[in-house]
From Swiss-Prot:
This is Succinate--CoA ligase [ADP-forming] subunit beta. It comes from the Bacteria. One of its GO terms (biological process) is succinyl-CoA metabolic process. Belongs to the succinate/malate CoA ligase beta subunit family. One of its GO terms (molecular function) is magnesium ion binding. Its EC number is 6.2.1.5. Its cofactor is Mg(2+). Coiled coil: none annotated. The keyword Hydrolase does not apply. Substrate binds at residues 265, 322-324.
Length: 390
């Protein structure tokens, strides 16, 4: 789950991590009141969306008076911001962060992720702040400093100092501030079950202070059951509507760009199914794992989600019955076809627990459902059917 910048900074404040004074607003008049509360005569207006690249897309603006402020907020609210990280529709702008300006002398990058290889939290720092860290990693990986955290003892102050001096910094007052910031970020990361934390940029002001100018936080979805405060921060308007619908039925769904819908039980089999579709000349429209405890109702809802994608021209159902019974899957398929009125080809491959019974139910249903003879045949059949439609 992703947080907005204003939500991320709210958390940073709780951990005594310095951020600029700011207020989130939902209408132009509130922006003027927010500016008066913040003080000063110049402010930064930031569109709140779950995507990077806002500045280049016009979503971050410097305003020099309250008339400009009100105009900028009015121009952004209610629009959809398209950046290099969004699709062509962009993300809806429903909130604006009004923030005090900062006297920036230097920009740095600071971040933390869970490294899958070492199975530990890794903190990263770079002198290349204010730009996409992915580009830095690609072009100049040597400019990214890393420290790996031992979970038995946690982040140690000497590791913070390693990063500090590695950035070419020397001032002792800044070293103490930097150490406090990194230690606070580590506590935030571990206590709130984060999967990603980025401060980009971490700025050094003209007076030598360190301030977190922007913040990005991702939370581990599997930990939301014990993070009630963070769970309430979820903004479903920023998420794909199909994925939101799938979460309500405990379905693992990820939308892709192809035109062949996939419904599979098991993440590994789902990925293999998508691979085989590609090898057969097709393009999968989604990843959808109904899980090992699929019910008739969940299968029906899975079909609804798949066909709600207007790009889908055919559906491949690939089920290996272990825990899940193939006859239950067949019941769900029949129910979905009747309820939703599916008018695209459906190819089904059933193997394992009650596969013969499931195949018989599909055959006796009288519906135009194509039974596949095997895994490879299923992929070839659906690619062929979609090709005929195209």
């Amino acid at each position: 789950m992703n947080l907005h910048e204003y939500q991320s900074k709210h958390l940073l404040k709780k951990y005594n991590i310095p951020v600029p004074a700011s207020e989130v607003v939902f209408n132009p008049d509130a922006a003027v009141d927010a500016a008066a509360k913040i003080g000063g005569d110049r402010w930064v207006v930031k569109a709140q969306v779950h995507a990077g690249g806002r500045g280049k897309a016009g979503g971050v603006r410097l305003v020099k008076n309250k008339e400009e402020l009100k105009s900028a907020v009015k121009a952004l609210l209610g629009t959809r911001l398209v950046t290099y990280q969004t699709d062509e529709r962009g993300q809806p702008v429903n909130q604006i962060l009004v923030e005090q300006t900062s006297d920036i002398a230097r920009e740095l990058y600071l971040g933390a992720v869970i490294d899958r290889a070492s199975q530990r939290i890794v903190f990263m720092a770079s002198t290349e702040g204010g730009v996409e860290i992915e580009k830095v990693a690609e072009k100049s990986p040597e400019k990214i400093l890393k420290v790996t955290i031992d979970p038995a003892i946690g982040l140690q102050p000497f590791q913070c100092r390693q990063l500090f001096f590695g950035l070419g910094l020397q001032d002792l007052k800044q070293m103490r501030s930097f150490t406090d910031i990194v230690m606070g970020l580590y506590r935030l990361f571990t206590e709130r079950d984060l999967s990603l934390l980025e401060i980009n940029p971490l700025v050094i002001t003209g007076s030598g202070e360190l301030i977190c100018l922007d913040a990005k936080i991702n939370i581990d979805d599997s930990a939301l059951y014990r993070q009630s405060e963070l769970r309430e921060m979820r903004d479903t308007t920023q998420e794909d509507e199909h994925e939101t619908m799938a979460q309500q039925w405990e379905l693992n769904y990820i939308k892709l760009d192809g035109n062949i819908g996939c419904m599979v039980n098991g993440a590994g089999l789902a990925m293999a199914t998508m691979d085989l579709i590609k090898l057969s000349g097709g393009d999968p429209a989604n990843f959808l794992d109904v899980g090992g405890s699929a019910t008739k109702e969940r299968v029906t809802e899975a079909f609804k989600i798949i066909v709600s994608d207007k790009n889908v021209k055919g559906i491949l159902v690939n089920i290996f019955g272990g825990i899940v019974r193939c006859d239950l899957i067949a019941d769900g398929i029949i129910s979905a076809v009747k309820e939703v009125g599916i008018d695209v080809p459906v190819v089904v491959r059933l193997e394992g627990n009650n596969a013969q019974l499931g195949a018989k139910k599909l055959a006796d249903s009288g519906m135009n459902i194509i039974a596949a003879k095997g895994f490879a045949d299923a992929a070839e059949q659906i690619v062929k059917q979609v090709g005929v439609i195209a």
